Design a protein with these regions (language model features):
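Charged, gly/pro-rich active-site loop segments
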Residues: 81-139
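A short, Trp-centered hydrophobic/proline-enriched beta-strand micro-motif
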Residues: 11-26, 67-71
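Short Pro/Gly-enriched beta-strand edge/turn motifs at strand-loop
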Residues: 3, 16-21, 100-103
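Short glycine/serine/proline-enriched coil/turn segments at secondary-structure junctions
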Residues: 27-30, 76-78, 129
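Charged, amphipathic alpha-helical segments
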Residues: 1-7, 51-57, 103-104
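Short, surface-exposed beta-edge/turn micro-motifs
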Residues: 16-18, 45-47, 64-67, 114-116, ...
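A short mixed-secondary-structure module that forms the rim of ligand-binding clefts
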Residues: 38-76
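N-terminal leader/targeting helix
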Residues: 19-49
Length: 139
């Protein structure tokens, strides 16, 4: 059992360069995509990712906000899955909060690019795997 869930999982999450994010398609099937690490996180409850407004994933989250994110430490073969919902944010404050230098590579019109938005993932439950065992938890 984890002694300090937020510290243990936060440390795992912060050391991964890639995260996996899943949505549900119109046929009810999961769709998983590798993404860069979240731009910002608030504990293990809320995570912010940048993406293109025109992406397939944004359309899926608007139709069905159920989502899952996964972080894996392949060196020690441990990982955490968080289940929750995604909200697509397009307001100026949310976009500015996670904007980074170099983002014009993806969003050439800058922070106000209409094809730039923020995915805010809010976790409800999770499952942590380490040392050949799993632990379910509530966030």
């Amino acid at each position: 059992m984890m002694r300090d869930k937020e510290q243990t999982l936060g440390n795992l999450i912060d050391h991964q360069g890639v995260s996996f994010i899943s949505s549900v398609d119109s046929d009810g099937f999961p769709n998983t995509k590798a993404m860069m690490s979240p731009r910002k996180r608030e504990g293990i409850k809320t995570f912010y990712f940048s993406t293109n407004t025109s992406s397939m994933r944004v359309g899926q989250y608007r139709a069905n906000p159920k989502a899952c994110i996964y972080f894996c430490d392949k060196r020690f073969f441990r990982g955490v899955m968080l289940k929750g919902t995604v909200e697509v944010l397009e307001d100026a404050a949310s976009k500015a909060a996670i904007w980074q230098e170099g983002d014009t590579t993806y969003y050439p019109l800058g922070v106000t690019d209409p094809d730039y938005c923020v995915l805010m993932f809010t976790a409800q439950t999770g499952r942590y795997y380490t040392n050949f065992s799993s632990e379910d938890f509530t966030v």
